[in-house]
Amino acid sequence: MTDLSLVGIVGGGGYIGGAIARELSKKHVVKVIDIREPTWNIKDYNISFCRCDIRMFDCVQECLQDVDVAIHTAIIQIPRINEEKRLGFEINYVGTMNVCEAVYRSPKVRGLILTGTWHVFGESGLAGVVDESFGYRPDKVEDRARLYVFSKIAQEVIVRYYDEMSDKVYGVVRLGTVLGEGMPEKTATNIFIERGLRGESLTPFKHSMYRPMLYVDVRDVVRSFDIYVNKILNNEVEMRGSSLSRVLNLVYPEPVTILELAEIVRDTIARLTNGKIVPKIEIVDQGLQPLFTEDSKYKFKVDISKTIKFLGIEKLIEPRRSIEDLVKIRLQHRM
């Protein structure tokens, strides 16, 4: 490996891809591969831009031809995937095939890492030990999330198939719901923080307030991808065993329910404002059947020991600290 290794980040204009790109540019040359340029200025970093519609194989192949490692973060998410199903299929399925095939054919690219998600496990009925081999349960999510989860499972399966038939690394890092500045506006965490800082009530829905969520801090995401990339470049990824050996669960192991999330945000805002702002929590009953019970989070245990060992890190940032740091940043912006 040299300091001039080139990392190509497909979908690098998005939140997670952009965060990874900026972090990796400290040690590598980075190329963002996306249909739109990032909203942040790539000239501030060691980053170039290659415009590409990943539905077009020739374009993908051209953009990836000179990279050493590829990271695939492109995805059509909720709610757009439900509004434009064909686009979701073409980007999430065909696009992923194109990225994997371009890596497969390239004499230069050493491997690929996919940003996966914990949602492939499903959300309801989690029980027992949840580790990398827990399995896929796309029918254990809300209807609005089904096509997204289908897509993330399909992306994993495509990547893992290439891993099984190639001598290159095709890895997956399944992420918890990512916490960090710049995260999508419509996430529960962002909504709670913004409403809370305005002194408005935090309004979890009654039917989902006990939903156990798995989170990860964006700082843990970027450092983990940095480590994984370096392992590929240094030939330190063990290639024996099935493709599951190259799959990692990157989540803080203690689940947090939506109600607990609201309570953490409320308490954090109250403490950091010295009691000047203490948002109320008001449960909203939409008349829907409850999907979870108060003890749902205690019915399963998350095992991330494989991830900790593979990455060589001691522990992950807990969600409570992530939220505290986010609230501090938002308060500074309001001064």
Residue ranges of predicted features:
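N-terminal Rossmann NAD(P)H-binding glycine-rich loop of SDR-like oxidoreductase domains
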Residues: 6-26
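Rossmann-fold cofactor-recognition segment
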Residues: 45-56
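NAD(P)H-binding glycine-rich loop region in Rossmannoid oxidoreductase-like domains
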Residues: 54-91
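Conserved internal alpha-helix in NAD(P)-dependent oxidoreductase domains
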Residues: 75, 86, 90-97, 110, ...
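Conserved Rossmann-fold NAD(P)-dependent oxidoreductase catalytic core, especially the SDR/UDP-sugar
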Residues: 97-147
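NAD(P)-dependent short-chain dehydrogenase/reductase
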Residues: 126-128, 157-230, 265
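Active-site helix of classical SDR
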Residues: 147, 151-154
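C-terminal substrate-binding subdomain of Rossmann-fold SDR/epimerase-dehydratase oxidoreductases
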Residues: 200, 204-335
